[in-house]
Amino acid sequence: MAGGAREVLTLQLGHFAGFVGAHWWNQQDAALGRATDAKESPGELCPDVLYRTGRTLHGQDTCTPRLILMDLKGSLSSLKEEGGLYRDKQLDAAIAWQGKLTTHKEELCPKNPYLQDFLSTEGVLSSDGVWRVKSIPNGKGSPPLTTATTPKPLIPTEASIRVWSDFLRVHLHPRSICMIQKYNHDGEAGRLEAFGQGESVLKEPKYQEELEDRLHFYVEECDYLQGFQILCDLHDGFSGVGAKAAELLQDEYSGRGIITWGLLPGPYHRGEAQRNIYRLLNTAFGLVHLTAHSSLVCPLSLGGSLGLRPEPPVNFPYLHYDATLPFHCSAILATALDTVTVPYRLCSSPVSMVHLADMLSFCGKKVVTAGATIPFPLAPGQSLPDSLMQFGGATPWTPLSACGEPSGTRCFAQSVVLRGIDRACHTSQLTPGTPPPSSLHACTTGEEVLAQYLQQQQPRVMSSSHLLLTPYRVAPPYPHLFSSCSPQGMVLDGSPKGAVESIPVFGALCSSSSLHQTLEALARDLTKLDLRRWASFMDAGVEHDDVAELLQELQSLAQCYHAGDSLVD
């Protein structure tokens, strides 16, 4: 591990969290593979914050995510729970019993063709059980790019992807995957549907001890653990798993940052009554309990509402995506997540998770909203001031927390990241003697341009901003979502020439007054429920008094975001 890295341990809880996480780790892998590219700006993001180094039993160096993930039986497809890097057939064959053996062999899931192709380019598992890795620069990241004599790699299609492991291109450590065997991923029976079920999972000694052992394994090898980031499904029983996990982290690792990303999949329909009621209850219980035990909580969704009334999914001017496909939705959310988490992953002058949370969560405002412009609309020949001026007075990013349009709302504090803009475009290149069309055009650095723009948009608001040269790397299996973009993500008038390879992204975390209306609406929807009709949810471990307390907590939390409650009032 590189000296000085401020390590983060990621917990990934739930199946949609698995989709977002797969895209997230694929992006980290793509960035690692580009680390030796002379054209890349070196040293902006520190991979050791998220990754750990290790060595197999056969002495081969490995680089794997510092990750614990939990999912249900049947969710892994052909991915092995113990991973592939550390497998040893010689040890598997060492059986002490000398008597008669009966072998029960379970039929293997067919491997996704994309993963077969990926593994064949990464290396092979030889007959002696040793994983032979092909040569990779620095032992990290993706293999070298294909040449004219090598076959073109397969790209997974939407039709070929059933579960997140179908497109994960990163090797995991054997301590990463923890399966909840008592609940099923597929089918109508044995599902993890309710908050109370999720809470009870981590109350069982078996699963609690399993999680604690894995936490201790990763934490004890860290030099300076700054905290934990939790990617957690909010819509199902994993909201309860996440709440108990956050409580355990708060108790065991007091003083460390805990930032929770509450994930919700695409749009829903009125006709699915039970599923919608459960989603409402799970989201409400999850938000309140996660807020109690986290430093910061941010809902992430492409939906327009957290409540019972369906709203259309959000729109991106330069993206064409199918909101019913988790593969698409999770790719967009992972792009935003990789951008807004930049502050605590920087190599130089990082903002710790605790400091970031403290800045955004004053006066009890521990829930924040996220937004992103994907891609940031910079046309050939334009400068950053030109592009920012095109937004006018409108909020420049698309909302990603199901809190409605941000227009007319108030921001109390914000953390903003703009990445992937070439340094030559940071400032206006006006001909000497030409009067600047705006104050932004008179700025002498990109950082000054961004800071002044934010000050104009949100006067008297506590803002933290970061400007990075490093773009978001769009590498297979990222879906084809972009329209009218160059390979570097610049906005084009005509047809694009070649596939998009990277994009600039503008992302933000904001403590916003929009949460006042969102949380109050959530509480109103809950008061309309006849809980006698949803006895199955209550039977999973939730009492009527718990619902009454939930309503009080939601209303108190909503009041924190009343437009008049800020540092400047």
From Swiss-Prot:
Pfam families: Misat_Tub_SegII, Tubulin_3. The modification Phosphoserine is found at residues 41, 495. It is found in: Mitochondrion outer membrane; Cytoplasm. GO terms for cellular component: mitochondrial outer membrane. Gene3D superfamilies: Tubulin/FtsZ, GTPase domain. GO terms for biological process: mitochondrion distribution; mitochondrion organization. This is Protein misato homolog 1. The gene is MSTO1.
